[in-house]
Amino acid sequence: MSLNSLDLPGKPEDTRVVVAMSGGVDSSVVAGILKREGYDVVGVTLQLYDHSAAVHRAGSCCAGQDIEDARRVSESLGIPHYVLDYEARFREAVIDPFANSYVSGETPIPCVSCNQTVKFADLLQTARDLGADALATGHYIRSRANGAHRALYRPVDTDRDQSYFLFATTQEQIDYLRFPLGHLPKAQVREIAEELGLTVAKKQDSQDICFVPQGKYSDIISRLKPEAANPGDIVHIDGRTLGRHDGIVHYTVGQRRGIGVATGEALYVVHLDAANARVIVGPREALETHKVFLRDVNWLGDTPIADLPKSGMEVFAKVRSTRPPRPAVLRHADGQTWVELVDGESGIAPGQACVLYSDDSNAARVFGGGFIGRSEREPQAEEMLRRLMANADKASAA
């Protein structure tokens, strides 16, 4: 049997596709394209939170006006549309872990958790319950057949590349998901929205963390976890106490501006000592990192990660969403997985993701990745930080 444009057997009219509709232009265009090609399209929107500020705030998603926009687009396309209340699930799976992670001194990525749990687990099951052959989304990433399964690849429009936030997608989920925008540049997506007469054609793209009004995540965390706003010391990596802070929630590793101390030297946040409410600062060279240890690894390579050669596997690693993939070596031994960064990186924070690729081109395959549990700096900085933490432990025990 021949395959249709979604690599599924059968004619489009015999293929049901659930489209995850956020109310934005991307997912709306996905619904429009598939409807135009003759697929049996069903739109589903998740209500994830209900902050009153989001109702009229530009750049939000999955609440207020966005749900209404998704409904209007579905109506104009002539497709059924359902709104599912996932607010409690979103709080449990995304918002609470986000706050807990900050309290522990990490810099979390809630978008990964949302994709990993709510969107690609819960919503995928809903799509199956609706009898769908696939779940389509407006993410900028590509997938294509790889033997009996499908593999992920970076999109044509690397400026919109969302593969960093999708590294935790499991093989089972990848096989069921479809990403119709992966081969299109954003400008063309806007043009298609105009052609289809979609009311959201000129709508602003979502910005920042969707559930954080005006991007002030510290307000949300302080409300959920008041201890994150406990004051403490700002300490130089060499042991000097430089001043006080109003809560580690206001800081992240690699930060330079707004530290709150003036010493005449350029200082960066090197480490967040959550247990002792301390912000550790130091010179830029103290941020230089060549090795990161990963947890919760999702490996999508063809060879099982436990079977990697002792010499490791040459890959390209991305440790921040805004940075390009850089040369690295992936290693796995004794139950641990780590990545050695050939050129080193600065400002690597625990809780962030390290995503692995076959190369640095826009056709690179995504090999998965993991969350950064800890990292190793240059030997001198590593020893200074170790000594500083050991002294704090002794003081606490005294």
Curated annotation (Swiss-Prot):
Active-site positions on this chain: C114, C210
Regions that span the bilayer: none
Residue ranges, annotated region (Interaction with tRNA): 160-162
Gene Ontology biological process terms from the UniProt entry: tRNA wobble position uridine thiolation
Location(s), subcellular: Cytoplasm
Record flagged with keyword Zinc: no
Keywords: ATP-binding, Cytoplasm, Disulfide bond, Nucleotide-binding, RNA-binding, Transferase, tRNA processing, tRNA-binding
Pfam families to which the protein is assigned, alphabetical: tRNA_Me_trans (PF03054), tRNA_Me_trans_C (PF20258), tRNA_Me_trans_M (PF20259)
Binding annotation for ATP: A20, M21, S22, G23, G24, V25, D26, S27, L46, G138
A cellular component term, taken from the record's GO annotations: cytoplasm
Disulphide linkage map: C114-C210
Catalysed reactions, as listed in the record: S-sulfanyl-L-cysteinyl-[protein] + uridine(34) in tRNA + AH2 + ATP = 2-thiouridine(34) in tRNA + L-cysteinyl-[protein] + A + AMP + diphosphate + H(+)
Enzyme class: transferase
GO molecular function, a single term: tRNA-uridine 2-sulfurtransferase activity
Keyword DNA repair: no
Annotated site residues (Interaction with tRNA) in this chain: H139, Q352
Main localization (coarse): cytoplasm
EC number of the protein: 2.8.1.13
Its biological purpose: Catalyzes the 2-thiolation of uridine at the wobble position (U34) of tRNA, leading to the formation of s(2)U34.
HAMAP family recorded: tRNA_thiouridyl_MnmA
Family recorded in the similarity comment: Belongs to the MnmA/TRMU family.
Name of the protein in its database record: tRNA-specific 2-thiouridylase MnmA
Gene label: mnmA
